[in-house]
């Protein structure tokens, strides 16, 4: 969590509770369909007709609001203008991505400088802004720059080999074009001649500089028109038409010229000198070089006054904007949205390109598909490598395989020099077994190997070895650990809490059984790879201990191999806990001895001593007793760092109903609720009908 997030959340909620609820007429069906609109507008009951209306709500200055504005005028009702917030979403609205923030204006709208707006009033009042608000603004600005966040967040970073990143580049000036029909131009005192003036001025004022013109990608492909496209055919002028993350672009130029684009304000956030030629909301306050002739009249009429960048940011992003918590759909804060967008932006960048999923069953396709539903991922399913060999692959194509990947898929990728991604269930997965066709809330996607393969470094190992964990990670990891341990959450959350506690003074050792043909044993436990051999070795090394053997739930349910007969188990174990859930067993154990079981990680979360006979992902970091060396893992970790890398940075999580991305804390909360609902059902032996019904539901959702 961010440092000020909880405080800001409380302030926002308190302010909303004070509002008197009124009836709002919203004629626009599109506005009414915005997810969680009632949360964003808590002061209103929302109606689609005007009967009994006490206010009217519309979208900015769009022509579609004429009806709503006319109704408000005729009935002498206040009109509320909404618009997308300045940190909106991962993908574009036209692509179906809903807003996580909106602005609410009961006076005008921020891009219309022909009259006052609520944002303008907030900025004018910013000289009395509390120090706490300014501190929050400073932290939020830093996070936005750190994570390269903007209104939309799907665009790739400026490539490493781009000329703008060259250390020997000349002085660079960025001119920001806009598209015809942009209302911020019309209501910002500008037209085509304004863009021509800006362009010529930039050339004249920077005779030695390279000039880069940023236009919209839709302009070059003919979908939209820009103002500067025809003017760039000049020496030292370059056209930037590709989609590029705005912050990464702005950080690599020296000076910026714009008319009314929001990128102008982002240039100020990046510390770049900015010259404006229109009347954007951030002009006239003394933070930019403003050339529009009406700036003076705004100052004379006291609609502008000296304000600093921090005050402008605080007014626009903290006070003027409203936010959802994207993980829960509840009222949120700027920091909730920053945190969420930073996470899903990393995921989008990780999955960018064309992904070919080869030879996967319909069930696993249905399970996997929602995890790859991000703007820049083009997921395609294909039945075999033979069919894939006939496909003309794009330059950004990769192959996606389940687990470590079938040998034929791995060999095909190597032979054709195609990068291979691997995926697997996450570590807090579901209430119910995967072999019982219960879909997961989390998956891991690994571009290096896969976490259970100790033969080669995985992305998780890289994260644990190299990630610069910060205080935010520390706080989130501790909170997550507390949630999981206090609510007894594990990977599958199955089994009964009925367990005969050992009555002994001996050291109690828990030995979790595993699925013997599991890839984690094949690639992570070269010396001991059978449950019976593990049990025998633990007894030989601990002759005086009280040993509890816990068979793997997939083995108990009859779905996988690894069974030990009762007689063999009794030869080395004092007790076998077949039906008990693993966390109940952990409560009574002093130590856990395992090959590669995830139980070892869950034991570390609960402060237990762990001995590893194989090389699981959590071994080798100084937190476990390891029988096998793994020199690659040279970093000594604290437990919270292991938690952060394993549960926060490595997996992806989705909501089981909405299929939208969520964070680890929200996933844990969902599992807690699901587990409480199924307390009377241990979940190990799921009936055939229940399996098929669940499978049909999942398949249906995936193809909706």
From Swiss-Prot:
Coiled-coil segments: none
A GO BP entry: polysaccharide transport
CDD domains: beta_Kdo_transferase_KpsC_1, beta_Kdo_transferase_KpsC_2
Membrane topology of the entry: Peripheral membrane protein
One Pfam family linked to the record: Capsule_synth
UniProt keyword terms in alphabetical order: Cell inner membrane, Cell membrane, Membrane, Polysaccharide transport, Sugar transport, Transport
Subcellular location field: Cell inner membrane
Top-level taxon of the source organism: Bacteria
A Gene Ontology term for the protein's cellular component: plasma membrane
Functional description taken from the UniProt entry: Involved in the phospholipid modification of the capsular polysaccharide, a strong requirement for its translocation to the cell surface.
Protein name stated in the entry: Capsule polysaccharide modification protein LipA
Organism classification: Bacteria, Pseudomonadati, Pseudomonadota, Betaproteobacteria, Neisseriales
